[in-house]
Amino acid sequence: MSHNTSIASQGMPAMAGPETGGAGMTDNVYQSLLRNRIVFLGSEVKDENANALCAQMLLLNAEDPEADIYLYINSPGGSVTGGMAIYDTMQWISNDVATVTMGMAASMGQFLLTAGTPGKRYALPHAKILMHQPLGGVGGTATEIAINAKMLKDTKRELSQLNADHSGHTLEQILEDSDRDHWFTAQEALEYGLIDHVYSNASQLRGDAPNQ
């Protein structure tokens, strides 16, 4: 897979958001959230912040293998490899992972949102969700182009199958609906099966989480 392969939206400006590894008040805020079993994806998915999110979920699993973990998402998408590391960690740990989006869950952000524990996938009322196919630059020699094109095609099918599994649609339906940028309002995402609830108040979410 090309390192350029991503499922970030074409033409979409980079989302401003916290990056792991800084210092100061922002770090203190995110450490406080972690103590409350909340991890936050607030920027483009990159290998660096994906590693941090995986480590945080593994830590929370080690501390309590039963209590829910909350993954909050406001992301334009990004690295497929980074996103798949987060996805596999969500499946690996024993905890339910509740996913919550505000602002935007686009591309890989949508994929991770929909991959949350069934019944515990949430959107705030004005969130926007984007589903589409992975993007990747293909260059080099003819042989390299053919290899990368096959990898991109395989990645497209793999992600589409997982999206189908988590949303209750067929692979064919997901491939058709995501062939071009497909934007959803929170309510439309609920009706399509990408999420389970549209909530405007945190107390509603907590009521769905008996382990908290």
UniProtKB/Swiss-Prot annotation:
Gene3D superfamilies: 2-enoyl-CoA Hydratase, Chain A, domain 1. The keyword Nucleotide-binding does not apply. The keyword Cell membrane does not apply. It catalyses: Hydrolysis of proteins to small peptides in the presence of ATP and magnesium. alpha-casein is the usual test substrate. In the absence of ATP, only oligopeptides shorter than five residues are hydrolyzed (such as succinyl-Leu-Tyr-|-NHMec, and Leu-Tyr-Leu-|-Tyr-Trp, in which cleavage of the -Tyr-|-Leu- and -Tyr-|-Trp bonds also occurs). One of its GO terms (biological process) is protein quality control for misfolded or incompletely synthesized proteins. GO terms for molecular function: ATP-dependent peptidase activity; ATPase binding; serine-type endopeptidase activity. InterPro entries: ClpP, ClpP/crotonase-like_dom_sf, ClpP/TepA, ClpP_His_AS. Signal peptide: none annotated. Pfam families: CLP_protease. Disulfide bonds: none annotated. Residues 1-20 are annotated as: Disordered. The active site is at S107, H132. PROSITE patterns: CLP_PROTEASE_HIS. Keywords: Cytoplasm, Hydrolase, Protease, Serine protease. Its EC number is 3.4.21.92. It is found in: Cytoplasm. CDD domains: S14_ClpP_2 (cd07017). GO terms for cellular component: cytoplasm; endopeptidase Clp complex. Fourteen ClpP subunits assemble into 2 heptameric rings which stack back to back to give a disk-like structure with a central cavity, resembling the structure of eukaryotic proteasomes. Cleaves peptides in various proteins in a process that requires ATP hydrolysis. Has a chymotrypsin-like activity. Plays a major role in the degradation of misfolded proteins. This is ATP-dependent Clp protease proteolytic subunit 2. It comes from Cutibacterium acnes (strain DSM 16379 / KPA171202) (Propionibacterium acnes).
